[in-house]
Amino acid sequence: MKKIYLILVMMIAAAAPVAAQQQYELTQFFQNPQALNAAFTGIEKYWQINAGYRKVWAGSEFAPSQSFVSFNGSFYKPDLRLNSIRISRPEAYEDNLSNKEYRKLNARHGLGGYYGYVTNGMSVDDQGSLTYAYHLPLTRSISMSAGAGVAYMNTYLSAGTYYVRHTKDYIYQDLTSEYARKRELAINTGVAIYGSRFYAGYSTTRLAFLKGTTDDIYQEPVNYVAHTINAGYQLYLSPSLRLQPSILMAYDRLREASVYGNVKFRYKEIFWAGASYRNKEAYGMMVGFLLGDHLSMGYAYEQNAFEFDAAHNNNHEVVLGYRFFRKGYRVNSYFW
């Protein structure tokens, strides 16, 4: 019975880094920039709400599933002088501003949030985060930002779903009644630089954290800092067609470095399709639609790159989004 208890303990310990970085497991990680790096919070001049669902190893009895909801947007004060200008492109007014006026007009604050929930029927990982960033134009075409956030991570075992020979064992009864649980509160920071054709950012997660558990075995702190670098570029192949590669690299001392990459073709602001890769883990394809100016939908399918049986080889992911614009403005995304 002690062996069973040790296995359960090891599952919680192994789940901790996953809970801290569960957003990276999404194939469409670019849908949640504020979860990757706090500095990307409010990178767009509009508000967006996303909801997604990911099913891993479809067909397996204890297949993990992941759900998330997020929001991201920016606060900025529009120049009221635009209201008196009757032109088809209101942004044209900015062309006549001095550099100082331009920076003042386009500096803005970003606010974002993310909540993710992962379960396989026996254990649960959930995480919530709230992020803030300040964006300041460096030139007419390049801006920089700095951000910070706080994340709450919670991992626990649903002990009632396990079956053992001796149900009267005191360890099993304790797990059933109290659950084995681990909680963490972390501080995340990041910086970024971006323009209409590129973005690049660096962030640290778990810079500091508070920790609480339901068992003395977890009270010994094991602190570490995770580092993340992400970058993207878009190349205009024609006025209507763009090539958009992007990459995400994550590293901490507890796990091997992870590399997540994708490349997409985007047709106007209507349709995109591409391929993705996670080093030594999986590869797949993605497709997305922009239904009008506000509603978006993305789908991804992944195939495991390592040897596995067919029942564990189907990973599906769906993301729905809704964008809110200021009246009279339509802008392209800075993050892909």
Question: Residue ranges of each PLM-predicted region?
Answer:
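Sec-dependent N-terminal signal peptides
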Residues: 4-14
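Hydrophobic alpha-helical membrane context
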Residues: 14-15, 49
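Sec/Tat signal peptide C-region and signal peptidase I cleavage site
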Residues: 16-20
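Subset of outer-membrane beta-barrel
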Residues: 21-336
